[in-house]
A protein has these predicted regions:
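A structural signal for small-residue-enriched, beta-sheet-centric alpha/beta enzyme cores
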Residues: 1-75, 79-89, 99-407
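Generic structural marker for isolated residues within well-ordered, non-membrane alpha-helices
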Residues: 95
Length: 407
C-alpha cells in the first residue's frame, strides 16, 4: 500500500468541486460535489440517533434501493434535520436538479448536510449552487481539496487521505474526505465522510468491508459525546481501474479491506484531533482485555471522560480520572491488576500498578501530556484482546465555540 497525495479525486474517473452558495456562511465555500464519470456501486453507514436528518433518510433509501449512485451534493451551514416533510422534499429537489444538470437518474444522486439543526434549506440557493458545482467540477487534486474545504463547519482544517494498492497486478486507488469537529460520537460532528475508489468490487463485498471497518474507526472516536442526527459515511466504487472483481475470502479482499481501514482510521483520527477548541489528540489504547467488545467499551469510556479530557488539556497526570472512567464503563475487572501508562513523543511513564500510584515524576508526566498527541495505555491483565479509541482534550474554547454556534 502506497500513501499518495489527494482525496476524493485521487481515484480514476472522479471529479469534485467546492463553491460559495451562501447557504448560511458568507465569503467561504459551503457546497461540494463528488461526481463519477461512471455509475458506482454504493455502500454506506448512518447515524444511530433515532432523530435522523432528511438527507440521512434520503441516502439510506438510495443506497438500499438504487442499483447504483453517481453523485453526492453536500452543503455546510444548515443540517436539514428536524425539518419534516419539507426537508425531505428539499432532498428530492436537490437530487432532481443535480440529475438534470449532470444528465443522470435522480435516484443516483445522494445528498448530505451539516450545520444548524431546525432550519430549512434555502432551496433556491442550493439549486443555484448545484449549477455552479457542475460547471466547476474537475478531476484535479485541487478540486478535491476545495470540496473538502467546502464541507467544513467548525473544523479548523480540511481532512483528506488517499492510497494506492495493487489488485492482481492492476493499480487500484482509494481516496477520501471527511468533516467533523463538534458533535462527534458516531455509532455507525456531525461526522460526514466520503470515500471513492476505482476498484471493481461487488456491492455485497463493499458493504461488508465498510460496515465491519467503521466499528474500529469512525465508531471509536469521540469529541463531546454527542451523536449527530446527520452522521454519514458513503463509499463509491466505479470500477474504472479494471481489476478482476474483488471477492470475499481472497487475498485481494484483505488488501482492499486494509486500504479502506487506513483511509477510515486516518480520517477518524484527523476528526478526533480537530475537536472544537482542541489542542491535543488523545489515543486511549486498552490491551489485555477479556474480549474485543470489552476492550472497545473500556477505551471509549476513557476518551469520553470530560475529566480525562480536561486533565490532558492541563497536562495534569491525574491518573485517577482514567481509572475512574474504566471503572464506570460497565466492564468487570480487578483494579489491582491494571497497569496504566502515559505515552507521547516526549517519552513513556507508568503511573499506576498493583492498585496504587507508582510514585512517578510529576514533571516528567506533565511533559509527556503536553504533546499534541498523547496515548493513555491501560493493560487490563485479563486476556489478549485490545482496542483503540480516539478523542481530544477539553478546553475553554469548546464552550466559547458552542455557546454562540448559531450566531
Amino acid at each position: 500500500m502506497k500513501v499518495i497525495t489527494g482525496g476524493v479525486t485521487a481515484a480514476k474517473g472522479f471529479e469534485a468541486a467546492g463553491v460559495e452558495a451562501a447557504i448560511k456562511y458568507k465569503n467561504r465555500k459551503d457546497m461540494a460535489i463528488i461526481y463519477s464519470k461512471k455509475p458506482c456501486v454504493m455502500a454506506g453507514t448512518f447515524t444511530n440517533n433515532v432523530v435522523k436528518a432528511a438527507p440521512v433518510l434520503w441516502d439510506k433509501k438510495v443506497v438500499e434501493e438504487s442499483p447504483y449512485g453517481q453523485a453526492v451534493i453536500v452543503n455546510a451551514g444548515i443540517a436539514n434535520a428536524c425539518t419534516g416533510k419539507e426537508g425531505y422534499e428539499y432532498c428530492r429537489k436537490t437530487a432532481l436538479r443535480a440529475s438534470e444538470a449532470l444528465g443522470i437518474p435522480e435516484e443516483s444522486v445522494l445528498a448530505a448536510s451539516t450545520g444548524v439543526i431546525g432550519m430549512q434549506l434555502p432551496i433556491d440557493r442550493i439549486e443555484a449552487g448545484i449549477e455552479k458545482l457542475v460547471k466547476a467540477k474537475t478531476d484535479t487534486i485541487e478540486a478535491g481539496t476545495q470540496a473538502a474545504e467546502a464541507i467544513m463547519t467548525t473544523d479548523t482544517h480540511s481532512k483528506q487521505a488517499a492510497v494506492e494498492i495493487e489488485i492482481g497486478g492492476v493499480k487500484v486507488t482509494l481516496g477520501g474526505m471527511s468533516k467533523g469537529s463538534g458533535m462527534i460520537h458516531p455509532n455507525m460532528c456531525t461526522m460526514l465522510a466520503f470515500l471513492t475508489t476505482d476498484a471493481v468490487i461487488s456491492k455485497e463485498a463493499l458493504t461488508k468491508i465498510v460496515k465491519e471497518d467503521v466499528e474500529d474507526t469512525f465508531n471509536m472516536i469521540s469529541v463531546d459525546g454527542d451523536t449527530s442526527t446527520n452522521d454519514t459515511l458513503l463509499v463509491m466504487a466505479n470500477g474504472m481501474a479494471g481489476n478482476e472483481e474483488i471477492k470475499e475470502g481472497t487475498p485481494e479482499f484483505e488488501a482492499f479491506k486494509e486500504a479502506v481501514h487506513y483511509i477510515n482510521e486516518t480520517l477518524a483520527k484527523m476528526m478526533a484531533g480537530d475537536g472544537e477548541g482542541a489542542t491535543a489528540l488523545i489515543e486511549a489504547k486498552v490491551i489485555g482485555a477479556a474480549t474485543k467488545e470489552e476492550a472497545k467499551i473500556l477505551s471509549k469510556s476513557v476518551v469520553c471522560s470530560s475529566l480525562t479530557k480536561a486533565a490532558v488539556y492541563g497536562h495534569d497526570a491525574n491518573f485517577g480520572r482514567m481509572i475512574c472512567a474504566l471503572g464506570y464503563s460497565g466492564v468487570s475487572f480487578d483494579p489491582d491488576k491494571i497497569e496504566l501508562f502515559f505515552e507521547s513523543k516526549a517519552g513513556r511513564i507508568q503511573v499506576f500498578k498493583d492498585g496504587v500510584s507508582t510514585n512517578y515524576d510529576e514533571e516528567e508526566a506533565s511533559r509527556i501530556l503536553a504533546q499534541p498527541e498523547v496515548t493513555i495505555l491501560a493493560d487490563m491483565k485479563m486476556g489478549t484482546k485490545e482496542a483503540t479509541a480516539w478523542g481530544c482534550d477539553l478546553t475553554y474554547d469548546y464552550v466559547k465555540i458552542n455557546a454562540d454556534y448559531r450566531s
